[in-house]
């Protein structure tokens, strides 16, 4: 197989987005458009991927990291000029180069693979990805000869009345023989109304050289959607959401209301898991089998076990074990590890805490910067007092400890194995194992106090 290369065009500012955020960084289902494109391209067994950056170059590089190499297009002088920036990386390479726009987040690796196969089978020097549009207004038209061969691409504004009736459009994705691409690109002129160097002009150059130019027509126009404004962004979001949700349902996940369920493209969900409406799953999330999520739950960059239930709650950058019950209205904050068979109940906040197997915090508690052992019970209103205004301190609650209601554990402090803390205590010193800590004022009852008040 020939070596494969990819050039992703991501230099445009995207003025029609009317945004401070550069166009290709606008998210679709939680992931920037350009990252969707790059991630799909990387499935093609590439030898090298080059992203052409311009506006927002540093932000794009930061987002993509080492997934790509980069070339800067300092002035946006057209698509051919953009591809030419990759010349130092690719001009001396033998193989095929696929050129993709960074604002086409719905394009799949499967479609690009089919285009590459068509390119190879036809022994073409250039292959165009085309699609049939119900309304082709604004798109370049694919003009074919009587025998079906591609003759040229005509931009909408330059098309004749007859040519505008053509519904097969240029999607802006191409495959080239690498040597032919960089030989022809040096011949592209900017003699046009915009004064720019257009990549479609390479077709006529190659045809004039007697080279084969092919086209692969995808049956899915949605895939080729280019995002240039917020309307198209909304359409891409909807199409991507439908694709992601359909994949999970086909893999055995139940979505009670797919239209109101938002799942990251990077989420992995086990079979027989049920997701209720209003659930938002962001980033790299793993969810086991037979789990119930939602309604109205947000999970971000976390791992959730099997047979776990999370209702009306937030889990962020944390790990939750098997057979856990969370919520309603619980908040698992970053760097928390929740063990197996745990209960985290109403209005409980957990932050940066190891929470052991079979332990419980059922109501109205804050547990931060803590190590909670196994079989621990935190009564209603238990608080780890972890912050002195400057530093955070560790609270350790060892296996089998029982913390009574409305207790404050002032860190740094340790409650030993099997120890009890009496309700209403403020604990400032370590509690030995098996001991009972009582840290509250002794109750005093004053007889007839209220009666005497009312006499005054």
Curated annotation (Swiss-Prot):
Note on cofactor: Binds 1 Mg(2+) ion per subunit.
Functional pathway: Nucleotide-sugar biosynthesis; UDP-N-acetyl-alpha-D-glucosamine biosynthesis; N-acetyl-alpha-D-glucosamine 1-phosphate from alpha-D-glucosamine 6-phosphate (route II): step 2/2; Nucleotide-sugar biosynthesis; UDP-N-acetyl-alpha-D-glucosamine biosynthesis; UDP-N-acetyl-alpha-D-glucosamine from N-acetyl-alpha-D-glucosamine 1-phosphate: step 1/1; Bacterial outer membrane biogenesis; LPS lipid A biosynthesis
GO CC, any one term: cytoplasm
InterPro entries attached to this UniProt entry: Bifunctional_GlmU (IPR005882), GlmU-like (IPR050065), GlmU_C_LbH (IPR038009), Hexapep (IPR001451), Hexapep_transf_CS (IPR018357), NTP_transferase_dom (IPR005835), Nucleotide-diphossugar_trans (IPR029044), Trimer_LpxA-like_sf (IPR011004)
Biological-process GO terms, alphabetical: cell morphogenesis; cell wall organization; lipid A biosynthetic process; peptidoglycan biosynthetic process; regulation of cell shape; UDP-N-acetylglucosamine biosynthetic process
Linker: annotated span: 231-251
GO terms of molecular function: glucosamine-1-phosphate N-acetyltransferase activity; magnesium ion binding; UDP-N-acetylglucosamine diphosphorylase activity
Positions of Mg(2+) binding: 103, 228
Subcellular location: Cytoplasm
Chain positions recorded as acetyl-CoA binding sites: 386-387, 423, 440
Keyword Transferase included in the entry's annotation: yes
Family according to the record: In the N-terminal section; belongs to the N-acetylglucosamine-1-phosphate uridyltransferase family.
NCBIfam families per the UniProt record, alphabetical: glmU (TIGR01173), PRK14354.1 (NF010934)
Entry protein name: Bifunctional protein GlmU
Organism of this sequence: Bacillus subtilis (strain 168)
